[in-house]
Amino acid sequence: MEQIPFVSSAPNTLGIELELQLINPRSFDLAAAADELLAQMANHPIADRVKPEITRSMIELNSSVHEHPMGLLAEMREMRDALCDAADAVGVSVAGGGAHPFMRWQERAISDSPRFQYLAEMYGYLARQFTVFGQHIHLGVPSGDAAVRMVRGLSPYVPHFIALSASSPYYEGVDTLFSCCRLNAVSSFPLAGHLPADVTDWYRFEAHIAQLRACGLAESIKDLYWDIRPKPEFGTVEIRVCDTPLTVERACQLAAFAQALAVLVTREPEPAPAAWLAYRSNHFQACRFGLQGSYVTPDGQRLRLIDHLRALFQRLMPIADELGTGDMLVALRDESIRNGNDARWLRSQFHRLRDLPLVVESMTHAWRGERETAGAAAEVPRRRIRATSEPVHGVQALATPEAGVTPGWRPDRLH
């Protein structure tokens, strides 16, 4: 059996990746402008931190390694501003959010790299449907065994990350009824899911990878689209379930939450085997209902996810104070519990604007840090922002000759 070397990292270090939307500033549809944007940034100091993604309407922004989330936030703000300047120069805008509200997957162009071209050939339309946008959080760990223990310890909290970050309620012009529809695209791939319950240390992880290779099911760890997975070449555990938030501030708050939670799980016993029993149900509840979903704890108690999250924040606050991140966790807690997640904000924007292209425009403003635009959500009564299966209006911008759509087109009913 081939051994997989694990590069040791300092505990509690962290970094993030953000997959971002490139937006046409006139139609507010996606723009296949990644090549032009990357060329514009080729000589910029952060050029090596901006990467192409599977389709040409996406780019990925990678942080460096940090010990404290405030340092991460300072770097992300600098990179955001540099990215926006370059985007302005090539005539596009940038937005966060887990899915574009009205893009058509058929119009997406695959990026020109051997791996992306292979994925398109292998997975067909799924590769173009994979034009969705996530935040990955990396947490430093000292060894492979520590990485496996961390993955197992964090797994019961996957629903919390999903619900806190959810920002993909709309897809192809329809309110999906989900807070996070992005993960439905991820789950279509055959090696999506989670670490097998019987993988309890690095040796067993290596054995599992060897078995997948022997069966021709995977060539490398990159083929594992798990919710949380080890990243041995970085020396990290990678949390992969978060939608890309609408702002870098929320992205860094989530990183601070992950850092404190990682400390907590190293101090507590490993979750009971029953933790895996409700894994898929908890995952669905968080995607579908966000913070209002139900949650089954590892010991079998059923309660609202938001109530479990409140109790979790109480347990995390002493750790956050040790790490010097209390302010960031308080901000995440208060904003999420009082105003809801980004999915609710997007629905409140549509409630106010009645036009999906204008919602996308508000997403681009939020990404730039124009908080006066993003703050309007709190003014809309919660009871008036319920999800609906009715088709979304205000997508006339799609009905253009360029898009190949008949004028007057409306999205089909969801059901």
From Swiss-Prot:
Give the molecular function GO annotations.
ATP binding; glutamate-cysteine ligase activity
EC number(s) in its UniProt entry? Answer: 6.3.2.2
InterPro entries, per this entry? Answer: GCL_type2/YbdK_subfam, GCS2, Gln_synth/guanido_kin_cat_dom, YbdK
Superkingdom of origin organism: Bacteria
Q: What class of enzyme is it?
A: ligase
One Pfam family it belongs to: GCS2
Q: Which PANTHER family match?
A: GLUTAMATE--CYSTEINE LIGASE 2-RELATED
This protein is called Putative glutamate--cysteine ligase 2
Q: Lineage from the top down?
A: Bacteria, Pseudomonadati, Pseudomonadota, Betaproteobacteria, Burkholderiales
